[in-house]
Amino acid sequence: MMDKIIQTLTLTFTFLYYSIPMLIVGLFISQILIESNIIKKIYFIGKIFTRLANLPEECGIAITTSFIEPRMANIMLVDFYKKGIINKKELYISSLIDAFPAMLRHWDSLLPILLATLGFFGIIYFIILVLIGFIQTLIFMAIGKITLKNREYKEDNTDKKIKLNKDVVYTAFKNTIKYGIPIIRDITIASIITSFLIEFGFFDYITEIIKNKAYYLPLSVEEITVAVTQPINYIGAFVLAGEFLNRGILDEIEVVRALLLGSILSSIPALRFLAPYYIGIYGFKDGFNLMMISTLVRILITALFVIITLIL
């Protein structure tokens, strides 16, 4: 039992060591972007999303930021919510709309691996992943359009001149401390709970159940092999899929189907890392709700794509 506790604390410390510094840096940079008016210079990107979803213009600032750094965007939304600028429903919809820019932002980390393992077909698969994120964004934009009141958008005539001085840095630093302390507190507690569940095999148990069910699907052994490898080692799954594709064992549609199924299976172990992130930024209740809504909707959309490949 003592070994489990030590392992839990070690795992927690490791996660916090790698996540908190970047989170604080992201928070500080987001405050600099806001206070210096830099974000207003590229606000036109987010304006498209806010006007189609009946969201306040402030949400457009966060959505614009999500194309640069999704973590900063989420911190901005929480900041707006705590200041009373946006309400709870607008917070949820704005956060869930971030699916497309967040997925697109992975191009620099995911696309090179896909190109190296799957060649040109890796680009096709990445486009499919981006399309899934885009559909998720469209769904929540539609929900915003239906559930939020229509609003009039006035032309923003405020001063958009970029200002970088000591006052901007001081205000950004002060806000970073103000909002950073509760985030660090929540992310630490969430990390301890998540690490405890990891050490006692909760996520492995759930993943194993789902993997066993996957064998009942009408797929080839090779497709299942790629899919069940992905939660364990996604690079290994890409390499395996590339080998099967090059040897003609699987065709392009079968590889897509296998990798999409693998991404569904990967959703459960991914919660180990998503839980501290969401809960740390949004708090326990809202963080858990947003994490589960986003995960479930993405799984449903991905499952729909898998079904389409079975029909083709």
Swiss-Prot record:
Topology in the lipid bilayer: Multi-pass membrane protein
Please give the InterPro entries that the UniProt record associates with this protein: MJ0871-like
Query: Where do the TM regions start and end?
Result: 9-29, 115-135, 187-207, 224-244, 264-284, 292-312
Q: Which UniProt keywords apply?
A: Cell membrane, Membrane, Transmembrane, Transmembrane helix
**Superkingdom of origin organism:** Archaea
Can the keyword Amino-acid biosynthesis be found in this entry's annotation? no
- List localization entries: Cell membrane
Q: Name one GO cellular component term.
A: plasma membrane
Q: What is this protein called?
A: Uncharacterized protein MJ1556
What does UniProt list as this organism's lineage?
Archaea, Methanobacteriati, Methanobacteriota, Methanomada group, Methanococci
